Each structure stands twice: as structure tokens, then as C-alpha cells.
Regions:
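Active-site regions of metal-assisted phosphoester/phosphodiester hydrolases
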Residues: 1-156
Length: 156
């Protein structure tokens, strides 16, 4: 893309018992630094399964999962917060500040049917690119995986 970088990644899961949390924290630091280097050249759109629910609104059961379940530890939340403080915007949350919508559901116990999910999939954009974001969506009606697609439309 000529006007911006588009980066896609699967961010490593911290695993049960948060056994891989130190590796995850290193990944988050290195990824943020990489995105900042790109952003110094031209704006960035960063898409991916970030394996973190950033705010309590981003998962169905925040209290029972906090600091116990991979994807909702304070260290993982802080990793994404640092990325946002480094000049990136969670484009979906920016456009839908109060909406409860998930992009991932466990395959167990009919979680998707009961909408017991997590918002793990994000499209972060450089701050200076946010005014070019026309719309964002989480396509919950799309099936075929434990995740659903997320959509970002930039203005022409």
C-alpha cells in the first residue's frame, strides 16, 4: 500500500498458568518498537489476533478471568496500553466506545451461541490515520472459525 504500511500478526498466547508471559511481554515490547519505526516513515494499519482483551467491556466475564486467564492479565493489558500510548488507536473501540461485541468464542459449551466471548482481534491505526477510517465492524455473523472477521474501511 503506497500511503501506509499494513501489518498483520498473530500475537503469541501466554498459555495456561501464564507460563509464557515473559515471552509475551518481550514480544509486545519488540512489536511496539517495530510499529513505531514503521510509523516514523508512514502511517500504519496493524491487524491481528492480539490475544488480549484490553478493557472489561472486551470480554464476557472479566472478574473471573482477570490475572488468571491468558489474554486478560494486567501485563498483557499493559502491553496493549503501551502500544496505544505509542501513537496507535484501537479503531473499532474508537468508533464504538460503549458497544459490547466479541471476535472470539471458545469452541466449548456453546459459548458462541450464548455470546460468552472475548474481543481479541484488533485493527490499530496510527493516530494520524484515524481521520481516514470510514468504518469498522466485527462480523459476528461469519462462521467457520472460533474467531470472526473484523473489518476496517479507509476513505478513498
Amino acid at each position: 500500500f503506497g500511503d501506509c504500511y499494513v501489518v498483520t500478526a498473530y500475537v503469541p498466547n501466554s498459555k495456561g498458568g501464564l507460563t509464557r508471559l515473559p515471552q509475551r511481554q518481550r514480544w509486545d515490547r519488540d512489536l511496539t518498537a517495530y510499529l513505531q519505526r514503521l510509523d516514523a516513515v508512514k502511517p500504519v494499519v496493524f491487524n491481528g489476533d492480539l490475544n488480549v482483551a484490553h478493557q472489561p467491556i472486551d470480554l464476557a466475564n472479566p472478574k473471573s478471568n482477570y490475572n488468571k486467564t491468558p489474554g486478560y492479565s494486567q501485563a498483557e493489558i499493559d502491553g496493549l496500553s503501551h502500544m496505544l500510548q505509542a501513537g496507535f488507536i484501537d479503531s473499532w473501540r474508537h468508533q464504538h466506545p460503549e458497544d459490547v461485541c466479541y471476535s472470539w468464542w471458545s469452541m466449548r459449551s456453546g459459548a458462541r451461541e450464548r455470546n460468552i466471548g472475548w474481543r481479541l482481534d484488533y485493527q490499530l491505526v496510527s493516530h494520524r490515520l484515524m481521520d481516514q477510517v470510514a468504518s469498522t465492524a466485527i462480523l459476528t455473523d461469519m462462521h467457520g472459525s472460533d474467531h470472526c472477521p473484523v473489518e476496517l474501511v479507509l476513505k478513498a
